[in-house]
């Protein structure tokens, strides 16, 4: 495990399930096996506000009450975020991801390291590397509504890959009768209601609502690590794992 560059990330980025930019990059490290690039880990600036972060560290609510500007400054100074962990397929299954996380966690000199990752539900390598999972409690009624919407779209023939790809979704949607299109719109209305509750004012486009439905049913896991260096002994430890019902992963 050694210091890497943006070129190392670019060499493997197509293998990651998220194609968007990893954020404001602070550091990149790479794993090398022999002479081959086996994996990369990208550290980036933290997200401004995260509910599970406040659940793990309740004192942050007090910091927030002092003003958003000072809160954001505090978060940027004391947190760093793992934005990407990518392992080349040839080297998967031998612990590369665990070592990329474990060996680099202390290197950024922050009291806290955090990450949001959907795949953490299915591959607990972050926890094996020493991070603590904070599973925010899900709203059972909300999950039932989203699940019912997904099942309705399944009945109409939608697969997960169709819902996630806007162009495939549009083609699939156009292939249906007027009555079936109405059923699709009715099913996806629950997503629009969700975003209006979050403060969005504009109507959510249908194709975007379809992809959001899948994402809302598969929210990312939040994990946090407290630096054990004596320099950070005065910072609070994250609370124990908050359990919640396991998320339902829609079938493909």
Residue map of PLM features:
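Terminal substrate-recognition subdomain of acyl/acetyltransferases
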Residues: 1-81, 105-252
């Amino acid at each position: 495990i050694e210091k890497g560059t943006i070129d190392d990330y670019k060499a493997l980025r197509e293998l990651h399930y998220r194609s968007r930019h990893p954020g404001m990059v602070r550091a990149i490290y790479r794993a090398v096996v022999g002479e081959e690039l086996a994996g990369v880990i990208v550290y980036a600036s933290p997200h401004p506000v995260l509910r599970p972060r406040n659940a793990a560290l309740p004192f942050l609510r007090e910091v927030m009450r002092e003003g958003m500007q000072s809160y954001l400054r505090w978060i940027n100074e004391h947190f760093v975020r793992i934005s990407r962990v990518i392992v080349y397929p040839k080297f998967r299954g031998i612990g590369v991801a665990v070592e990329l996380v474990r060996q680099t966690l202390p290197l950024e000199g922050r009291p806290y390291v955090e990450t949001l990752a959907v795949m953490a539900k299915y591959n607990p390598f972050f926890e094996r590397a020493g991070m603590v999972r904070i599973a925010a409690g899900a709203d059972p009624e909300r999950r039932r509504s989203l699940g019912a919407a997904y099942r309705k779209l399944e009945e109409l023939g939608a697969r997960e890959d169709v819902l996630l790809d806007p162009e495939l979704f549009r083609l699939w949607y156009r292939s249906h009768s007027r009555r079936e299109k109405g059923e699709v719109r009715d099913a996806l209305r629950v997503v629009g209601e969700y975003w209006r509750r979050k403060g969005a004012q504009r109507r959510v486009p249908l194709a975007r609502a379809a992809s959001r439905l899948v994402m809302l049913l598969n929210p990312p896991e939040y994990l946090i690590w407290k630096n054990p260096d004596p320099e950070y002994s005065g910072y609070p430890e994250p609370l124990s794992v908050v359990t919640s019902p396991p998320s339902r992963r829609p079938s493909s």
